[in-house]
């Protein structure tokens, strides 16, 4: 089946209109296609610096050179490794100055916050914790839990099998999620690697239910669906339904 939910852009998520997860290359086209304004975004949690998750030209377009005046500050949160790699790329390929410099903060109305894993921090009204992703060694890739107003989600891409320290943190902080979003790069017949496959998603969902990490009415969604062994959306959605999870698609909206 061509088009519809089988036609996918690169992964990102928007929470409550003001919190973006990943400054990816497709966020502007997705915003226009789905009628989802990004005008109110004040915060961004960056998972890692791979090009399908971070397009630094979005930041350059905030400068006065592009006619932008009086833009509200965009606060970006990332690991030290991710922020330093982003700064190096931005200076070398785009702007000639470091993304971590006072000049960048002033010209781009932007601030980079370096975060550490397994230590809670506040992002505006959101309580957030970062977890080391099993992905892209040396790049400080992170997964995130986000809680506000008594509701919590876990955003788990990109990653292979979750580290045991992540499960331990879930227990120590008594985390219980209303929604879990997991990497599903590989399909049912493909082995996992630096990402999860379908059967590993099932294993993670089952363990989350067994350990009480997923709330009694919690839902598990697959995202980051690649071409490697994943069928068209209707077939994959049917497979997922049989195994206790759901398949996300571009433009999906979750409400409480």
Report the location of each language-model feature:
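Active-site metal-binding motif and surrounding structural segment of the metallo-beta-lactamase
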Residues: 18, 24-77, 177-180
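Alpha-helix termini
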Residues: 35-36, 62-72, 93-103, 172-175, ...
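Residue-level recognition of the N-termini of beta-strands and the immediately preceding loop/turn
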Residues: 41-42, 72-75, 105-110, 177-178, ...
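Core dinuclear metal-dependent hydrolase active-site scaffold
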Residues: 1-36, 111-168, 252-256
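Cap/insert and terminal regions of metallo-dependent hydrolase folds
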Residues: 160-252
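Active-site neighborhood of phospho(di)ester-bond hydrolases with catalytic His/Asp-centered motifs
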Residues: 20-24, 41-52, 77-79, 154-159, ...
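Short, well-ordered amphipathic alpha-helices
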Residues: 28-32, 57-64, 86-95, 199-209
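Short, aromatic/basic amphipathic alpha-helical patches
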Residues: 88-102, 232-244
């Amino acid at each position: 089946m061509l088009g519809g939910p089988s036609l996918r852009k690169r992964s990102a998520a928007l929470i409550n209109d003001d919190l973006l997860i990943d400054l990816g290359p497709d966020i502007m086209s997705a915003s226009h296609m789905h009628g989802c304004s990004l005008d109110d975004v004040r915060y961004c949690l960056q998972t890692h610096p791979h090009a399908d998750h971070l397009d630094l030209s979005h930041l350059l377009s905030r400068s006065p050179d592009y006619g932008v005046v009086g833009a509200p500050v965009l606060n970006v949160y990332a690991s030290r490794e991710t922020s330093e790699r982003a700064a190096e790329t931005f200076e070398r390929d785009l702007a000639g100055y470091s993304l971590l410099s006072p000049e960048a903060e002033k010209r781009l109305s932007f601030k980079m916050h370096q975060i550490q894993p397994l230590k809670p921090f506040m992002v505006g009204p959101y309580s957030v914790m970062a977890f080391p992703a099993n992905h892209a060694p040396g790049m400080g890739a992170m997964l995130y839990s986000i809680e506000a107003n008594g509701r919590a989600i876990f955003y788990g891409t990109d990653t292979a099998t979750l580290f045991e320290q992540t499960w331990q943190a879930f227990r120590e902080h008594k985390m219980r999620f209303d929604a879990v979003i997991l990497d599903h790069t590989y399909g049912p017949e493909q082995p996992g690697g630096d990402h999860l496959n379908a059967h590993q998603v099932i294993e993670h969902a089952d363990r989350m239910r067994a350990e009480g990490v997923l709330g009694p009415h919690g839902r598990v969604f697959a995202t980051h669906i690649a071409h490697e062994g994943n069928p068209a959306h209707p077939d994959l959605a049917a497979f997922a339904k049989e195994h206790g999870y759901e398949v996300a698609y571009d433009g999906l909206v979750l409400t409480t």
